[in-house]
Amino acid sequence: TLPIFIFDDENSKEHINGSASKWWLHHSLIALKQSLDNNLSLYRGDPKDILTKLTETYNVKEIFWNRCYEPWRIKRDKKIKSFFEEMKISVNTFNGSLLWEPWNVVKNDGTPYKVFTPYYRKGCLNSEMPRTPIQKPKIDNLLLDKTNSISIDDLELMPENNWYDEMEKLWTPGEKGAHNKVDIFIKEGLANYK
C-alpha cells in the first residue's frame, strides 16, 4: 500500500483554497503523516499525471481514493477514473468525509434539504447507520515514494505572516481533533437537539 496525498492546485481554477483552509490542511497532513509512521507520500500538481507516473513506477493494479463532492472535483475524478479503468486498473472510491452520500438524504422530490431540522429527522433519525470506518492499514505494509514525494513544507500551504497564532489555540486539525469535536457535539449538541 502506497498512501499518497495530491495537492491539486492546477484544476481548481477559481476554487482556490484560502489561507485558513491551507493552514488547516498543512496541520492535518502533519497529523496524518505521523499516524502513518511518516509513510505518506506527498505530491503537488495534476492528479492524473501524478497517478499515471505512480502506476508505472509501482506496477499499480488498484487505486483507492475518498470522493470529493464539489462539482469541478466530481468532473475531474470521473475523467481520472475512466482513464485508469481503460488501462485495466481498478479504481475504488469511497465516502470518507460524510455520514451519508448527498443523494441518499434528500426530500421526497429528490432535491437537497436547505433546513437542518428536516434533514436531521430524515438523515439522523430515519436513515441507515453510516458505515463504520475501515481499519488503518498496518504500518509495516506501507510504502513511501522516496524519489518523487515532496515535503509538507514544499506544498507551500502556510501563510507568510502568522495571523493564525490565535486559531492554533482554538482548533486542533487532524483525526484526533476531529474525534474530540465529534465527542463534544454528541454529548453537548446532538443529545440536546430538538
Where are these regions (language model features)?
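Trp/Phe/Arg-rich N-terminal binding region typifying the photolyase-homology
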Residues: 1-130
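Glycine/tryptophan-enriched, flexible segments
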Residues: 112, 118-194
